[in-house]
């Protein structure tokens, strides 16, 4: 009898469905600063990767646009000269159903970028290689930490906005 109750409880929860309907590069910029300035010799790159996330509801029911923005700057460790700058805005169009409303925001900004990440990694690797550098293979990005940091930042700003 306990098994029937457990089966009934799980049957009532909606099944989460997520489909990637499309994905594309919205904006891409690569500047080989090293070649433009004529920097030569041995360089030891120091790479800084900044990630920004955004999600928007589309006009079609259950469709969302998830945007991952990467800003990558590589500098020479020795002199601090900029070697290259890569800016990428990558978009995924998702059809999502069965996610409770209170869990939708983290789902969009954690799970969706996680699904897109292998494609982002390949693009960054190809662009850096095609730009005259060794392929830059990004480490895994902790989208949960990025989400939590953004929530903490917004909560810290909220009292300041109320008092102003």
UniProtKB/Swiss-Prot annotation:
GO CC, alphabetical: cytoplasm
SUPFAM superfamilies: SecB-like
Classification via Pfam families: SecB
Main location: cytoplasm
One GO term (biological process): protein transport
InterPro entries according to UniProt: SecB (IPR003708), SecB-like_sf (IPR035958)
Cleaved signal peptide residues: none
Domain of life of the organism encoding this protein: Bacteria
Molecular-function GO term, any one: unfolded protein binding
Keyword hit for Cytoplasm: yes
Key words of the record: Chaperone, Cytoplasm, Protein transport, Translocation, Transport
Localization per Swiss-Prot or TrEMBL: Cytoplasm
Cited PANTHER family: PROTEIN-EXPORT PROTEIN SECB, PTHR36918
Function per UniProt: One of the proteins required for the normal export of preproteins out of the cell cytoplasm. It is a molecular chaperone that binds to a subset of precursor proteins, maintaining them in a translocation-competent state. It also specifically binds to its receptor SecA.
Assembly with partners or alone: Homotetramer, a dimer of dimers. One homotetramer interacts with 1 SecA dimer.
Similarity comment: Belongs to the SecB family.
Protein name: Protein-export protein SecB
Species name: Ruegeria sp. (strain TM1040) (Silicibacter sp.)
């Amino acid at each position: 009898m306990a098994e029937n109750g457990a089966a009934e409880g799980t049957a009532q929860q909606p099944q989460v469905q997520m489909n990637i309907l499309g994905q594309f590069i919205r904006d891409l910029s690569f500047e080989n600063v090293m070649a433009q300035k004529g920097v030569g010799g041995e360089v030891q790159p120091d790479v800084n990767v900044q990630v920004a996330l955004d999600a928007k509801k589309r006009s079609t029911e259950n469709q969302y646009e998830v945007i991952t923005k990467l800003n990558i700057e590589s500098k020479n460790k020795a002199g601090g000269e900029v070697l290259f700058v890569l800016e990428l805005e990558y978009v995924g169009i998702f059809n999502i159903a069965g996610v409770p409303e209170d869990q939708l925001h983290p789902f969009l900004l954690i799970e969706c970028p996680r699904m897109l990440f292998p494609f982002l990694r390949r693009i960054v690797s190809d662009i850096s290689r095609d730009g005259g550098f060794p392929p830059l293979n990004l480490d895994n990005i902790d989208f949960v930490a990025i989400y939590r940091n953004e929530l903490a930042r917004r909560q810290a700003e909220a009292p300041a906005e109320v008092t102003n």
